[in-house]
């Protein structure tokens, strides 16, 4: 699991990476032997790395085009960091081209539906490479927040100041899962006219079935990887969140 979900930072060299649309300072990591995949190293608050890691992996397990993602073992005093596969993007195709290209139409709709299911309320960042659309940036999804993780990190201290019930509420606030399917429908069908109502409905039903088909063993692998660097309560939070998505997908 360590090799699969973690980047060995000592094997890479780093340079400052400047781009638009991603928050905070980032670095581009390349293998020191000048080969293999390059990664964008991203950190922006406690919840950024875990949301990117979980969002990208869950999307990939649903068959959505996304970059690979790895966690990085923190050095002493470091922030949480996620390494996201660098994909050099060409100019995005215009909506007219997407509407009339079956492959691009499907990729566009499924990319946005992944953000919908994971309740990522930020703008959907898209990349276009080798004739395919990819999505990224799930940092605002999954109902995870910086404050809750901070409380998890300091639960022993806060546990002496507040009741265990209050501590649990701060660490694991109730998840009110309500994906904005209507907003995505209006955008894709009514506003942008990317697809028909029938296409949207079929795609939503299909991506829900894909989510339900994700094996419990894969979910456990992802959560176990998180607990290598995050407090164990965070895995509990994601477990609750994933179960909420499953409930929605069964309806």
Residues covered by each model-derived region:
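Acidic-enriched, low-complexity/disordered segments with a strong bias for Aspartate over Glutamate
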Residues: 11, 33, 47, 68, ...
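Conserved kinase catalytic-core segment
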Residues: 97-150
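Short amphipathic alpha-helical segments, especially helix-boundary/capping motifs
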Residues: 28-35, 101, 196-199, 211
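Conserved ATP-binding subdomain of kinase catalytic cores across diverse folds
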Residues: 2-93, 114-121
């Amino acid at each position: 699991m360590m090799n699969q979900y973690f980047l060995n930072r000592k094997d890479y060299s780093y340079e400052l990476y400047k781009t638009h649309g991603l928050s905070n300072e980032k670095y581009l990591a390349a293998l020191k032997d000048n080969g293999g995949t390059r990664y964008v190293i991203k950190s922006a608050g406690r919840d950024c790395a875990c949301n990117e890691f979980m969002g990208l992996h869950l999307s990939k397990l649903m068959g959505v085009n996304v970059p690979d993602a790895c966690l990085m073992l923190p050095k002493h005093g470091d922030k949480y960091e996620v390494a996201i596969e660098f994909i050099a993007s060409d100019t995005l195709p215009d909506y007219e081209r997407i509407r009339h290209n079956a492959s691009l139409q499907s990729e566009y709709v499924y990319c946005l539906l992944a953000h919908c299911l994971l309740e990522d309320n930020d703008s959907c960042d898209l990349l276009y490479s080798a004739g395919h659309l990819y999505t990224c940036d799930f940092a605002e999804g999954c109902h995870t927040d910086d404050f809750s993780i901070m409380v998890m990190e300091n639960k022993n201290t806060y546990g002496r100041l507040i009741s265990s019930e209050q501590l649990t509420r701060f660490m694991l606030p109730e998840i009110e899962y309500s994906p904005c399917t209507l907003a995505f429908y209006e955008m894709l069908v009514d506003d942008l006219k990317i697809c028909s109502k029938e296409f949207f409905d079929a795609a939503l039903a299909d991506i829900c079935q894909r989510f339900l088909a994700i094996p419990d063993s894969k979910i456990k692998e992802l959560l176990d990887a998180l607990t290598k660097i995050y407090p164990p309560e965070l895995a509990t939070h994601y477990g609750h969140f994933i179960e909420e998505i499953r409930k929605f997908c069964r309806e």
